[in-house]
A protein has these predicted regions:
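Hydrophobic N-terminal alpha-helices or hydrophobic patches in metabolic proteins across all domains
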Residues: 1-135
């Protein structure tokens, strides 16, 4: 929930079975040309990761595009996304918690390899937590 009149610059959700270092599911922002609905699953491919510190903790955001949408067929890295869109996303995450008086600091974009590494680490973290439930 956002406390301000802002809206997410894409469809915002999480990557299933992927746990970020902050203990929450790994966040993802999917570039879409049409809005979807809460609870839907989108088969998406990552382009990069926006590094963010929220209330003193890392809170990375994966940027992805719908895998089967022909509009995004040629999007494979951050360099393929419009620069203005990347700037909008960075601006959004730098101000979206202003009315909560929460300190949020954008650390900038990192590329596809870093996004894949973050996703792989998050999946491993989730699997490790799952195993610990049965110990």
């Amino acid at each position: 929930m956002i406390f301000s009149s802002l809206h997410y610059p894409g469809d915002y959700g999480f990557i299933p079975q992927a746990l970020h270092a902050d203990g929450d599911p790994l966040d993802v922002l999917v570039m879409t040309n049409e809005p979807t609905f809460a609870g839907c699953v989108i088969e998406a491919r990552p382009l990069g990761v926006f590094r963010l510190v929220d209330k003193g903790q890392l809170d990375d955001k994966i940027l992805a595009v719908p895998h089967t949408d022909p509009l995004f067929h040629e999007y494979h890295t951050l360099e393929d996304a419009p620069r203005h869109f990347l700037d909008e996303v960075a601006h959004f995450f730098s101000v979206y918690k202003d009315l909560e008086s929460a300190e949020v600091v954008g650390k900038g974009w990192e590329g596809l390899e870093q996004a894949y590494a973050e996703i792989e680490n998050a999946v491993a973290r989730y699997q490790g937590d799952l195993k610990n439930l049965f110990v």
